[in-house]
From Swiss-Prot:
Function (record text): One of the proteins required for the normal export of preproteins out of the cell cytoplasm. It is a molecular chaperone that binds to a subset of precursor proteins, maintaining them in a translocation-competent state. It also specifically binds to its receptor SecA.
Keyword NADP appears in the UniProt entry: no
Keywords per UniProt: Chaperone, Cytoplasm, Protein transport, Translocation, Transport
Localization per Swiss-Prot or TrEMBL: Cytoplasm
Keyword Chaperone: yes
Species name: Saccharophagus degradans (strain 2-40 / ATCC 43961 / DSM 17024)
Signal peptide per UniProt: none
Name of protein: Protein-export protein SecB
Subunit structure: Homotetramer, a dimer of dimers. One homotetramer interacts with 1 SecA dimer.
UniProt xrefs under PANTHER family: PROTEIN-EXPORT PROTEIN SECB, PTHR36918
Pfam families: SecB
InterPro entries, per the entry: SecB, SecB-like_sf
GO cellular component: cytoplasm
Entry similarity comment: Belongs to the SecB family.
Amino acid sequence: MSEENTTNNEAAAAEGKAPAGFGIKRVFTKDLSFEVPAGLGAFSLQGQPNVGQDLNTQINRVDDTHYEVVLKVTVTVKMGEDKVAFLAEVHQAGIFQVVGIEGPQLQQVLSTACPQILFPYVRETIDSLAVRGGFAPVLLPQINFDALFVQAVAQAKAQADSQAEADA
């Protein structure tokens, strides 16, 4: 693998292009929210906790080689059927430098590698918020961002194909 990278970088240098590279410039919490809608009543709720998780990624181009990637995760913990114990929302962001990667490969790096780097920060923040809020720790499961990306690409292709058929 390292021979392949070296060969690709040497070829890029011979063509006058910068060698392919990826780096983290900064990781930061962009937005944070913790809510206990039931107030004090949340601590007397009965039932089995049900943890719901919603996530999405936002990609913003900063300049020619830098991108801001924001991983937005909302965790809602309900007791029983519909009684919300608490809601935590974290927007974890990173500034990433990407050089020599373009097109679909760039989109894949920004949609998979960057969120994979940011997710441990989100997990720790949500767990800490829950504990500091007086609740049991919340241990979010690991997420396969590669599989989510493949699924999103397949859905977009299927949607484009069905739109093309409808237009024909």
